A protein has these predicted regions:
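Dynamic "connector" segments at or just before major functional cores
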Residues: 1-178
Length: 178
């Protein structure tokens, strides 16, 4: 037996996100993002880089796998209030933000984030596994080039280098090179 009743309170299909929001507060991600040198908006009306990163994570946690999927989360007023955003950014704002990243910015931002992460974990010995693979590409994909490809000789491919922290089951870094 259960009761059905109506209420004026707003609801969200992503109620479990409140736990993720609490986790972000407890680990201090916002403070870490402030110090890692995120690219700033080009306008004084722009969104905070921390909000854009948080919205990007929120989109992924809610099942989005494209920038456009952020629109479903953007219009959820419960999530907006939960994360303390005055307004939510359009998916194009996320695209513009991530287009500001280049190889130097990536090295700076992620170097600082990884340092913060490993300081939080307080791990003093690590096993670092390095690996590479060949990913055959079909069609005209950005960054693909002819190179070493034992399966499909002469085809375009990427040859990424990957580093894993075996003890933590964590990807330490990945370089998607042609």
């Amino acid at each position: 037996n259960f009761q059905l009743r109506f209420t004026d309170r707003e609801i969200t299909p992503w109620g479990g996100i409140s736990l993720m929001q609490r986790m972000l507060e407890q680990v201090g991600l916002e403070a870490a993002l402030r110090q890692c040198g995120l690219p700033l908006p080009g306008s004084n009306r722009g969104y905070s880089p921390i909000q854009l990163v948080t919205q990007f994570l929120l989109n992924i946690w809610c099942g989005g796998n494209r920038f456009e999927h952020a629109e479903a989360v953007r219009h959820d007023t419960v999530l907006q209030r939960l994360f303390g955003f005055a307004r939510m950014a359009n998916f194009k704002a996320l695209i513009r933000f991530f287009n500001k990243f280049n190889q130097a910015t990536n090295a700076q931002v992620f170097g600082r984030l990884y340092r913060w992460l490993f300081d939080q974990l307080q791990v003093y010995r690590l096993t670092l596994d390095l690996d590479s693979t060949v990913m055959t590409r079909y069609g005209a994909q950005a960054g693909a080039a002819k190179g070493y490809n034992p399966r499909r000789r002469g085809r375009l491919s990427h040859h990424p280098l990957m580093a894993f922290v075996a003890d933590l089951r964590l990807i330490a870094n990945c370089w998607l090179r042609p």
